[in-house]
Design a protein with these regions (language model features):
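Acetyl-CoA-dependent GNAT
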Residues: 5, 9, 13-19, 24-37, ...
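A general structural signal for short secondary-structure boundary/capping elements
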Residues: 54-59, 144-145, 149, 162, ...
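Hydrophobic beta-strand residues of extracellular immunoglobulin-like
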Residues: 66-69, 129, 164
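Glycine-rich phosphate-binding loop
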Residues: 110
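Conserved GNAT acetyl-CoA-binding A-motif
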Residues: 122-133
Length: 173
């Protein structure tokens, strides 16, 4: 049980019964973060076809993925998905934080940091992640003291998406 000055929450491994809530939260956070120019049909299609109950169930069964959630009294606040098999450039950067999604109602309350700290206790550090250069989460990673170690770009929705790549060590948590 984690406590901060605002609330108490539990962090635990996700179970199959969490998958429907995870799908809803993921679609919600994704649209809130990336649909900055409004809800276009292709955004809705992506979110609804990607973040499904079956998607999260498959992650629970995948040998290199680990999925942890933060909840309070059955209310899902956020989750972290790590991929122990993914590397960025070199093994020295550790494993990948594939997703760190916190519902906007719980952002700024220590949930994201607590999820990353819990992951570090279970799987060690360092860990790396990438985030869209226009994502407000860049401020969070900067405050955390994460080290900017590169950039990563890919094509999506007819545009080039530029991302910052960060490395997080135990000193950041």
């Amino acid at each position: 049980m984690n406590k901060n000055h605002r609330h108490t929450y539990e962090i635990r491994r996700a179970i199959p019964q969490d998958c429907a809530k995870l799908a809803e939260l993921a679609a919600d956070v994704w649209l809130d973060t990336y649909a900055t120019d409004g809800i276009k049909p292709e955004y809705t299609e992506y979110a609804n076809s990607t973040f499904t109950t079956a998607y999260f169930q498959s992650l629970l069964e995948h040998p290199t993925y680990r999925l942890l959630i933060s909840e309070q009294a059955g209310v899902l606040q956020g989750f972290v998905l790590i991929n122990l098999g993914a590397q960025y450039r070199t093994p020295d950067n550790g494993y990948e934080v594939d997703k760190l999604y916190v519902h906007k109602s719980f952002q700024g309350m220590g949930v994201g940091r607590a999820l990353l700290s819990h992951v570090a206790r279970l799987y060690g550090t360092p860990m790396w992640l990438y985030t869209w250069t226009e994502n407000a989460a860049n401020q969070f990673y900067s405050r955390l003291g994460a080290q900017l170690i590169g950039t990563l770009s890919f094509e999506a929705f007819g545009s080039t998406i530029d991302n910052n790549v960060y490395k997080i060590t135990s000193e950041n948590l």
